[in-house]
Amino acid sequence: MLPGVPYLRRPRIRLVVERVLGVARARLGVRVVHYSVQGNHLHFIVEALDKPALARGLQGLAIRLAKAINGTLGRRGKLFADRYHSRVLKSPRETRSTIRYVLHNGPKHALERGEVTPEGALDTYSSARFFTGYADRDPMLVERAWRSTPDPPVCRAQCWLLKTGWKRTGLLRTNELPAP
């Protein structure tokens, strides 16, 4: 994000991001599997067929998000400082660490600021409620989240690493924070 963009972890911004992801998910050419809204940036884990599809899809997503977030904040102009940063996930361990980072980065920063969050509480500014890989969360709650959301902001993973491969290194726990 550009300097001067207001703090993004607000309910209105989260709803806008989820709405954009829900509407755009079938049109982007990429599949957003996990996301989180941070204070001044967004995290996504996506599946794409190739680099050109990834570039086109994320460019389209950035445009849609910028228009929607700017509209919500009552501002105009460029929102994102630069293009996205990407990394191809290559191993089950790296994939598990990345999922943990994206879904649990908000609570990690809250803890660093001295904020108290309930044990095992999910980050409401992420796609954690749609995540099926928690060892300590009832799978029926996840299925209920999928069924009760007409246009979910994320897609179910299709590639082996994001769907099952990462589980070889152990399911996540809701209170498991990213490494410092």
Language-model-derived ranges and their functions:
Residues V5-N40, E47-P180:
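Short Pro-Cys-Gly-centered "Cys-loop" motif that presents a nucleophilic cysteine in a tight turn
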